[in-house]
Structure formats: C-alpha cells, structure tokens
Swiss-Prot record:
Changing residue 17 to A: Has no effect on efficiently routing num-1 to the cell periphery. GO terms for molecular function: ATPase binding; protein domain specific binding; protein kinase C binding; transmembrane receptor protein tyrosine kinase adaptor activity. It comes from Caenorhabditis elegans. The modification Phosphoserine is found at residues 17, 65. This is Numb-related protein 1.
Length: 593
C-alpha cells in the first residue's frame, strides 16, 4: 500500500513540475521575442521564481489592465498622425468631409440651441449676435445629430423621440459662419419657407469644432452649385435637341393624310436605329448620371422637356373672350313681382299707404282720411261732431280742383251763394204763432247785389291767383274751433231741403258765416252757455236751435212731403252727442267693412 501510494504522489509531483517548467520556458521566449511598439505599453518586470507563482499571476493581471483597448489604440494612432503632430493643414484634416457630404454620410453630434429671427441675410456679426441671444435664453439645448448633404441640412433629435427638428434645403441657406468667441459655436442663416423671414439657427458642437461644421456646410454649397450648373447645361442641350427634332419632323399634311402604302419610312427606320427609339419615354432619364446621384436626388435626373410646337397649334389657338358675370344678377330686385303694364313697382308701396292706390297726379288725389294715429304732418285733430243731429248724415267730401291749390279757411265752401241774413224778429214771430215752416228760410231768386261776402270772395280769389302764380301756399293757422265751425257749416248746407249736396244752387238765401273776415251786417243772437265756443264765434246750428226753442227739432227731421204741419210730428228730443264716441263708432264700422 505504501509503495503504491508513494508512487501516486511521486507521479503527481512530477506532472506539476513539468507544467511549471513549460510555463517558464514560454515566458522566457515571449520576453526575448518582444520588441518595443506603440500598440501596447509593456512594463518590464523581473522573471518570478518558482516560489513566487502567486506574484506572477498578479503581475499578469496588471499587464492586461495597462494595455489600451482596441478603439483607444486606433485613436492614439490617429493622434500620432494628426496634423498637429505631423504639421499638416486643417484642410487636409477635413478632406474626408467633402466625400462624406457628397455621399450623404456626413454627420456631427451637436447641441441645438434653437432659432431666432434676424434682419440681415449675411454677416458674421449677425450670426454671433444670434448665438449670443440664444445662449442668453433659458431654453435647454437639445442633443441632436446634424446631417450635412448636397441637398440640405437635417437636424435629428438624439433623445428618445428621434424626431426631425430641422429640415432645411441647401438652396434656402444664405450664410454660415463659426463663432469667433467660442470654438464649438456654429450658426447659419436661411429663409423660412412659411413666414418668408430670415431665421438664424445656432449649434454647439460636442466633439468637433465650429470651423469644421462650417467647412462641411461650405462643401454642401459647392456641391449644390455644381448640380445646378450641370442641370442648366443639360436643360439647354435638351431644348436644342427638341427644337431640331421639331424642325425635322414631317409636315402637318403628311400627319393628317398619311400614305400607308409608302414603305420609305420603314427603310429609314432600319437605316437609322436611333429613330426606332423616338419615344420620349425612353429618353426621360439621363444616361450619364451615376447611381449614387440618382439615389440621392432622383428628381434632378428627370429632364424637364419643353413640348414641341408646330404651326398647326398656332392655327388652333382661338382667343376666348374674358368671362363676365350676368349683369342681371347685380340688379337690385324688389319683393313685388308686378305685371309689366304697371308703371312701376315702387309706386305701389309707400309709407303709411301700402294698401291705397295713389295716383301720381296731385290734382286727382283724394283727401286723406283723418285718424287718431301718427300722421305724416302736424295737423290738428278734429274733435267736433260730424253728425251733430244724430241722423246718419255725413258731410260731403269736397274735392279740390286745380284752381284751389292753396290751403285756406274757405276751401270747400261755395262762395257763389248769395247770403242774406234772416231777420231775427220775424223768426221769433213765426215761432210764437207755431208756424215753424214759415220761419225756415226759403230760396228766393234775387238780383245780384254786391255785399260784404262778395267783396270777401273777390279778396280770396285774388289771394288764390297770387298764390298760384307765385307757387307758394299762404300759411294759415287754424284752430280746432274754426275747423269745427267749417264742418258744421258743410253739414248744415248738405241738410238744405231745396238744394241737394251734390249740386248746390248758384244762389241761396241761406246765411253763411265765414271763418274769418268782416263781421255780418247785424249782430248774431246770444248763445247758450253750454254751446258757446272758446273763440266766441256762433255757428249756424246754434242759431237754428235758438229759433226752435219750443220743439228743439231740426228742420232736416221734418217730412216735407207727407205733412203740411211739421209741428204735429212728434220727435224725441235730441241728445248731446260725444264727438269721441262718433269717431270710435266710425272707426269700428270701417274696420268691419
């Protein structure tokens, strides 16, 4: 057992010793073959003994920690080859940026400060002032990535949103410059497409300098200019080719009247293979443009062709008149669709007379009906009795003729009637005897005599002639009592038994008291207190009531044909009539009709 066990231990120890010998030989070979280089910083350490294996393991870990990672080793290699070390210029350092801009892969990590409106399209002072104002604002900068290409500038948010902050075409950019106060600052001025204002966008580069960003944008300017020149040249060439093709095309008569039996066109097509692809669809893209340019800007590859024109198009051009609106739509149309035979629709609708037919001739107009409502002119309201006896007799409507245009107090009174006042003592004598009919004045034909009323008539006729010739109306002021007396006078004249109201006789012995003028030949009888008027002028009706004190009946109520003695007819005594009741009853009757 002991021998076998000893053999086991001895074999194990020998194996361990062999391994240690191999590791020592490997380390010695590495140290001998190792040469100095910039890739790894190796610290020369003394070779540990066999007894210090733990120390050797710790040193190996230290060596591994001192070695630079691969990315840092690449950057250190670039640092050794940088222009600052080698003495090269900045343009050589930024030379790869131009190729990256052409391929559309140039990008920089920046902090987007925002945009502010400026009032000039170029200038370093303008950009520096905009950057200063953006830094002074309390807006938090946004971490973003600036992509620079020949088409435009794009700013993409680097946060969670990954949204597009700015998408600016390079044609709209007018100026760009770095900030001379800070190395990381950069700004460019562009025209805003929506508001048409000059806006300045500010950036702060995180890893690069503002000069490098400005150089990349300058490369984008040059690439855009080259594309524009190339596009203009190709467009000019295409225009020349299209003009040549239009001149060498077949005449119009051959187009409208083709000869299908002629095979000359087939021979020409076989001789010139280029004519077989005369369709413009095959020539719509430029053949010499590279795939990269087509991928970056596919719209610029398409040729803007001018349509070919021939003289037949000029023949077909017909000038069309300028469209005009219907003039009837601009005419003001009334609400009434009246027949064409009417004079005008506006005459049928007037203020306060929408349901009346009013003629244009002022001489044929009927007098307007008096009402208690609002009137167009300030006229006194009639408050007297139109039918004082309650017999249903209305005063006749007197129409004005062309000769009586002036408004005076004697309008409607026939001044041709000759008036002789009846003596009062005779009337009283007949009344005492009971013969009331004899006391009533009778019509007698007398010779024309010149009395005070005739003089008054001549005076008023002269006034009318003067007013008609001068075209002015004599202003008269009439009181309510005067109007009431005139109306009572017309009623009493219409109640005359011997003279009808429609055609009054030329002469009459009926006494007429005018509204104004000289007094009559004799004084009138005294008036009762309850029938006296405020102005003190008596009426005809009051004189008749004084004459018939016994019966108080009106002569118009006597039946002249049936009874010779009117005193035998019993009539109820006349009751006083309220003028307001008469007016309201008349309005009610008119409304029912």
């Amino acid at each position: 057992m002991s021998a076998s066990q000893g053999n086991v231990f001895t074999r194990g120890l020998s194996r361990i010793s062999r391994r240690k010998k191999k590791t020592k030989s490997i380390q010695n070979s590495l140290v001998s073959e190792q040469q100095p280089s910039f890739d790894a910083a190796i610290v020369p350490m003394p070779i540990p003994n066999d007894k210090s294996s733990i120390f050797s393991k710790g040193m190996d870990r230290l060596r591994r920690s001192l070695r630079l990672p691969k990315k840092r080793r690449d950057r250190s290699h670039d640092r050794h080859l940088s222009p600052d070390v080698t003495g090269g210029s900045k343009t050589e350092q930024w030379q790869p940026d131009e190729g990256a801009v052409r391929t559309g892969t140039c990008c920089f990590n920046v902090k987007y400060l925002g945009s502010v409106e400026v009032y000039e399209s170029r200038g370093m002072q303008v950009c520096e002032g905009a950057l200063k104002s953006l830094k002074a604002s309390r807006r938090k900068p946004v971490k973003a990535v600036l992509y620079v290409s020949g088409d435009g500038l794009r700013v993409v948010d680097q946060g969670n949103s990954r949204g597009l902050l700015v998408d600016q075409t390079i044609e709209k950019v007018s100026f760009c410059a770095p900030d001379r106060q800070t190395d990381k600052g950069f700004a460019y001025i562009c025209r805003d497409g929506a508001s048409r204002r000059w806006m300045c966008h500010g950036f702060l580069a995180t890893k690069e300098t503002g000069e490098r960003l400005s150089h990349a944008v300058g490369c984008a300017f040059s690439i855009c200019l080259e594309k524009k020149k190339r596009r203009d040249e190709e467009t000019a060439q295409v225009n020349v080719q299209s003009a040549q093709e239009s001149t060498s095309s077949t005449p119009p008569k051959d187009i409208f009247h083709p000869n299908w039996e002629d095979n000359t066109s087939e021979g020409t097509s076989t001789q010139n293979p280029s004519n077989s692809r005369s369709n413009l669809a095959y020539q719509s893209f430029r053949k010499h443009v590279s795939i990269e340019d087509r991928y970056l800007d596919p719209q610029s590859v398409i040729i803007n062709e001018v349509p070919a024109s021939n003289h037949m198009d000029e023949i077909r051009r017909i000038s069309k008149p300028r469209p005009t609106g219907n003039p009837a739509l601009f005419l003001r149309q009334g609400s009434l669709r009246a027949p064409p035979d009417m004079p005008s629709s506006s005459d049928q609708f007037k203020r306060n007379m929408s349901l009346r037919t009013v003629s244009n001739n002022p001489t044929e107009r009927s007098p307007e009906k008096k009402s208690f409502g609002t009137q167009l002119y300030n006229e006194p309201i009639y408050e007297g009795d139109e039918d004082p006896l309650g017999l249903g007799i209305t005063p006749p409507v007197v129409t004005k003729t062309s000769g009586s245009l002036s408004n005076n107090g004697l309008d409607g009174i026939n001044l041709n009637w000759k008036s002789i006042p009846a003596p009062v003592h005779q009337m009283q004598q007949h009344n005492a005897n009971g013969d009331f009919v004899a006391a009533w004045p009778q019509n007698t034909i007398e010779k024309p005599t010149v009395g005070p009323l005739d003089k008054l008539q001549k005076q008023f006729e002269d006034i009318k002639l003067i007013s008609i010739s001068s075209g002015e109306n004599t202003p008269t002021t009439r009181s309510k009592a005067d109007e009431w007396l005139d109306d009572v006078l017309r009623v009493s004249m219409s109640m005359s038994p011997t003279s009808p109201s429609s055609d009054p006789p030329s002469t009459s012995s009926y006494s007429v008291l005018p509204k104004s003028g000289p007094p009559p030949a004799h004084a009138p009888p005294p008036l009762p207190v309850r029938q006296a008027v405020s102005n003190g002028s008596p009426s005809i009706y009051q004189q008749q009531l004084q004459q018939a004190n016994s019966t108080r009946n009106s002569p118009a109520g006597i039946n002249w044909n049936s009874s010779p003695n009117p005193m035998k007819i019993s009539q109820p005594p006349a009751k006083p009539v309220d003028p307001f009741d008469v007016q309201w009853s008349r309005l009610a009757v008119n409304n029912t009709h």
